[in-house]
Amino acid sequence: MKMKWLISVIILFVFIFPQNLVFAGEDKNEGVKVVRDNFGVPHLYAKNKKDLYEAYGYVMAKDRLFQLEMFRRGNEGTVSEIFGEDYLSKDEQSRRDGYSNKEIKKMIDGLDRQPRELIAKFAEGISRYVNEALKDPDDKLSKEFHEYQFLPQKWTSTDVVRVYMVSMTYLWIITRELKNAEILAKLEHEYGTEVSRKMFDDLVWKNDPSAPTSIVSEGKPKRESSSQSLQKLSSAVIKASEKVGKERENFVQSSEELGLPLKIGSNAAIVGSEKSATGNALLFSGPQVGFVAPGFLYEVGLHAPGFDMEGSGFIGYPFIMFGANNHFALSATAGYGNVTDIFEEKLNTKNSSQYLYKGKWRDMEKRKESFTVKGDNGEKKTVEKIYYRTVHGPVISRDETNKVAYSKYVSFRGTEAQSMSAYMKANWAKNLKEFENAASEYTMSLNWYYADKKGDIAYYHVGRYPVRNNKIDERIPTPGTGEYEWKGFIPFKENPHVINPKNGYVVNWNNKPSKEWVNGEYSYYWGEDNRVQQYINGMEARGKVTLEDINEINYTASFAQLRANLFKPLLIDVLDKNKSTNGNYTYLIEKLEEWNNLKEDENKDGYYDAGIAAFFDEWWNNLHDKLFMDELGDFYGITKEITDHRYGASLAYKNISKESTNYKWVNVDQEKIIMESTNEVLAKLQSEKGLKAEKWRMPIKTMTFGEKSLIGIPHGYGSMTPIIEMNRGSENHYIEMTPKGPSGFNITPPGQIGFVKKDGTISDHYDDQLVMFAEWKFKPYLFNKKDIYKAATNVSALNMSK
């Protein structure tokens, strides 16, 4: 792949062509200057931060007001008021697990003055545009408001925090402990206690010392897999898990229809001066939050005396998550640390609104919520629901028959506004110490990355992690009777972190941060077979690296058949041992060794280039079924998401490579299974398609940005063009921190401006980065004023005194 010339050509094109344009929209009045570059990205120049953040809210609302409204309503639990009863279940869960306006205001009031004031100014900026739009709805309200017949509301700081919660908080409000308990209970019923616990420990291990980590350390921790301390749970856990699981499926479906981000992953890399070819620190960002139109990321430049920053953040956030200021570049990925526990509450047989806690019956907190729901005939009705809360948190399931309830305990509950404030402080930091101080105040589970002008890099696994009672197993729910409460939180300095690591770089794809760190119910995310190995392999195969090298590594990771990393060498080895018995095996070895493990379509004919990729895909599926389907039987369906997870298939690898496991999953020779799968798949492909791999080529999988509108209704706004499927960030930033400041290239598809006129007309910048994204082209990362004005197509001013 010829990456370097693609990058050079597009950057050259961008800098040359706009320079002689006349700024028809230029306004000489004083105020905040809004400089729109040739991709529609606003670069804001203000005389103070208050004006800057108000302008920030204003331009975001101008570009994406309908999207902001959906996010706000998504957390507020008022979607069904606009779109009807199909969304009531989602609203109910949002209210059940969420906060009242009063509770959010209390959080905001506890913030330091500057972030508190600037969040308010950001909200004022959104309201400023709302006021303008309400006065001129035909021109300034996007088509969706007219189509669905409702008006936007003015915003407050509370709404800004709600938008933050709807995306960031959702990731950690998880209930996997119930699913694990369901699996364990069903296995116990089928296989008995002793055997089932061995199986469970293999499926949901506590700690895999072979798992790749972002912090490279010497030595290996002891493998933890014993479940001798498993707490006894009620038989009601199966019913509760199935109920909560169904509710979550409905929540996910309706949220995706509304365009709310639920798939939060991400990859990132930082390179220090010793590993960098230029001696400058490098940073790569690849937040994975889905592909929709308009996108979830909003790009902006923020400039005020003493503060300059350029980059992207999630829509509605008053800060930048992926970008750089004058002093350093920053990025983030989801940390997947264990910040949520489910507690099993014992209910009073005489009063199911009471639960046993520390030897006494306590009344649950009780509150009534009213929902305004739009009916099919357009008329609105009121629906009332009662919600309960224990000392541990919101009650997510109650079983009146078995007198058991389950509540959700979240370590960062009540601190969400503090985390927003911490991110704003990270934006304003001028050095590593100030960045680290901001990181120490962040309470949700993320990985933070830092690369500065001095060549220094740093990585922090941020978050507020509980110190749990060592008598319980954190993979399943905890008894809520008071004996097994959290004992506090791990000090920030003990969270995994590293500054200027010896290997010269840090990479992450939501993998394990360090050898000793575990993540409870989601431990199967962090195993020996993990997708981050794509970035590790890429870095280790190179000496000193450039941004172009990192881009090539990212390209490889985006198209890789992830199972090929560990399983292809095993397959080739077994084929080599048996090649004398069948001439086809030598041919397969040749094709597998030629294959670069990528599912790409460089000749753009609509088929993956390598026919052997079709063989490997089918071989893997066949092999996986042979390893687990017969052994698990009816349980195969509920465990496949573990054994064939998108992050890796570690248990399958341990089985097929003859590593030690607690339970004997394979009762025949592993090589025999590999050969059986090979012979079956080979016979099928040769019979159906032909003898040679060139005939096996399969059609590419495609994806679109916004095939449906934000509420699931097809639209024709120019983003239905299919492109090849990529396991890639929703945007990419590549930044080099030179002595003069940040430089580099980026792409934020499908485009900057999501506004659709009443007549359906879209902006030129609605999807102008879509084809570039598909072709791995980039635009220049604009930071200094001279370059920004060279690329400008419109300069206007906002008078903040009006």
From Swiss-Prot:
Please give the cofactor(s) recorded in the UniProt entry for this protein. Ca(2+)
Q: What is its EC number?
A: 3.5.1.11
EC category name = hydrolase
SUPFAM superfamilies associated with the record: N-terminal nucleophile aminohydrolases (Ntn hydrolases)
Q: Which Pfam families match?
A: Penicil_amidase
Positions of the propeptide segment: 235-265
Co-factor binding details: Binds 1 Ca(2+) ion per subunit.
Any one Gene Ontology cellular component term annotated for this protein: extracellular region
> What keywords were assigned to this record?
Antibiotic resistance, Calcium, Hydrolase, Metal-binding, Secreted, Signal, Zymogen
Classify the main location. secreted
> Would I find Metal-binding among this entry's keywords?
yes
Q: Where in the cell is it found?
A: Secreted
Substrates-to-products reaction catalysed: a penicillin + H2O = 6-aminopenicillanate + a carboxylate
SUBUNIT field: Heterodimer of an alpha subunit and a beta subunit processed from the same precursor.
State the family named in the UniProt similarity comment for this chain.
Answer: Belongs to the peptidase S45 family.
Q: What is this protein called?
A: Penicillin G acylase
The species this protein was found in:
Rhizobium viscosum (Arthrobacter viscosus)
The lineage is:
Bacteria, Pseudomonadati, Pseudomonadota, Alphaproteobacteria, Hyphomicrobiales
The encoding gene is pac
